[in-house]
């Protein structure tokens, strides 16, 4: 199998294509990207027959910025007969996947695909039963086995393939299903909530998002991001010249500091989290984030970079490279991840975790 489907935000296909071409090429997995504007997906076609499987095995999915999900696929199945769509799909998957742990019948995240999604939901149940009978799926769902993907691009027209459970998005279509809390001050709260789901493993939440932690929210007004921190019982310094929602102030967990987020300097040395969603040039925000991390003013940070109209992948890459260079220069070992989230628009969200040990990823550093 030599094709990899990457789901992305509609309108960002070129960025997704540029990124996968760049990162696959650095691993000597060469190919070309098929791009259709506003389609919500990209197909990276490798030159070598087995390189699709090699790509999803060797390149960490967490290193991708513009892809929400990816999976390796075979040739496009077309003109599926309405009276029996299941048999051709089962036939394509037999011998490709054995004992998959989950089935996802998906579409791209576009308005045109909404009607098709209704069909996918109904189609999933009988298809799952047939795939279990054929040995393509296990008799029960398990997160330890490959995920089987059936991706419809039009009625009667789909790609079939799989992703690896340890190197994909755990979410259907790569989108966490979040509900807007009625008491939140703004919809931006969903950006931070999604970021926490995407960047922090669920089994580490109790330790890394613990009750009683101290946090700073730069550019906090009216408090959408502060709300998420308060909800996790943190003490929050909300920095903004604009007013905070009274409902947050009434919790007693928020200290409102009427200052410019770029000029504020923390007066305590036990801040676990700093978050930032300020509307400013990405280079200026990145420089500020580097300053916080180099000086050890926080342990972890989540921040947004607003994107220009052109060369968006290049802009993000340049800023992340600058941040990494600053950390390296000052001997700071850190983990950096970036993703264009479902709730992001013309922006990407970055998570950086400062590690105190020389070797990242140790259990006692989590």
Swiss-Prot record:
Keywords: Cytoplasm, Methyltransferase, rRNA processing, S-adenosyl-L-methionine, Transferase
A GO BP entry: rRNA processing
Enzyme Commission number(s): 2.1.1.186
Cellular compartments per GO CC: cytoplasm
Pfam families: FtsJ, RlmM_FDX, RLMM_N
GO molecular function, one term: S-adenosylmethionine-dependent methyltransferase activity
Xref: SUPFAM superfamilies: S-adenosyl-L-methionine-dependent methyltransferases
Binding site for S-adenosyl-L-methionine: 188, 221-224, 240, 260, 277
Reaction catalysis annotation: cytidine(2498) in 23S rRNA + S-adenosyl-L-methionine = 2'-O-methylcytidine(2498) in 23S rRNA + S-adenosyl-L-homocysteine + H(+)
Active site positions: 306
Compartment(s) of residence: Cytoplasm
Broad enzyme group: transferase
This protein's record includes keyword S-adenosyl-L-methionine: yes
PANTHER family named among the record's database cross-references: RIBOSOMAL RNA LARGE SUBUNIT METHYLTRANSFERASE M, RIBOSOMAL RNA METHYLTRANSFERASE FTSJ DOMAIN-CONTAINING PROTEIN
Membership in a protein family: Belongs to the class I-like SAM-binding methyltransferase superfamily. RNA methyltransferase RlmE family. RlmM subfamily.
Subunit-structure text: Monomer.
Function: Catalyzes the 2'-O-methylation at nucleotide C2498 in 23S rRNA.
Protein name according to UniProt: Ribosomal RNA large subunit methyltransferase M
Record lineage: Bacteria, Pseudomonadati, Pseudomonadota, Gammaproteobacteria, Enterobacterales
Gene: rlmM
């Amino acid at each position: 199998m030599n094709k990899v489907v990457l789901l992305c935000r509609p309108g960002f296909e070129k960025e997704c294509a540029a990124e996968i071409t760049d990162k696959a090429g650095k691993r000597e997995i060469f190919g070309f990207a098929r791009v259709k504007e506003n389609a919500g997906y990209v197909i990276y076609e490798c030159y070598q027959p087995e390189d699709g499987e090699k790509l999803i095995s060797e390149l960490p999915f967490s290193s991708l910025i513009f892809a929400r999900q990816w999976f390796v696929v075979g040739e496009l199945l077309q003109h599926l007969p309405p009276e029996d769509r299941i048999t051709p799909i089962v036939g394509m998957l037999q011998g490709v996947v054995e004992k998959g742990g989950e089935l996802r019948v998906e579409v791209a995240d576009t308005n045109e695909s909404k009607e098709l999604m209704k069909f996918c939901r109904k189609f999933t149940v009988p298809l799952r039963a047939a795939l279990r009978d054929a040995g393509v799926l296990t008799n029960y769902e398990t997160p330890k086995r490959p995920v089987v993907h059936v991706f419809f691009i039009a009625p009667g027209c789909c790609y079939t393939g799989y992703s690896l459970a340890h190197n994909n998005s755990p979410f259907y279509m790569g989108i966490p299903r979040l509900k807007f809390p009625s008491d939140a001050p703004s919809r931006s709260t969903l950006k931070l909530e999604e970021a926490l789901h995407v960047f922090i493993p669920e089994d580490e939440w109790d330790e890394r998002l613990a009750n009683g932690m101290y946090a700073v929210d730069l550019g906090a007004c009216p408090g959408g991001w502060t709300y998420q921190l308060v909800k996790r019982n943190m003490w929050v310094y909300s920095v903004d010249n604009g007013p905070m929602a009274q409902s947050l102030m009434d919790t007693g967990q928020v200290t409102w500091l009427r200052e410019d987020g770029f000029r504020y300097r923390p007066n305590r040395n036990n801040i676990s989290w700093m978050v930032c969603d300020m509307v400013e040039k990405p280079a200026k925000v990145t420089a500020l984030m580097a300053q916080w991390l180099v000086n050890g003013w926080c342990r972890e940070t989540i921040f947004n970079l607003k994107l220009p109209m052109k060369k968006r992948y290049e802009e993000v890459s340049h800023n992340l490279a600058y941040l990494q260079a600053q950390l390296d220069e000052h001997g700071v070992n850190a983990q950096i991840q970036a993703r264009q989230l479902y709730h992001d628009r013309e922006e990407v969200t970055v998570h950086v975790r400062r590690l105190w040990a020389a070797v990242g990823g140790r259990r006692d550093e989590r």
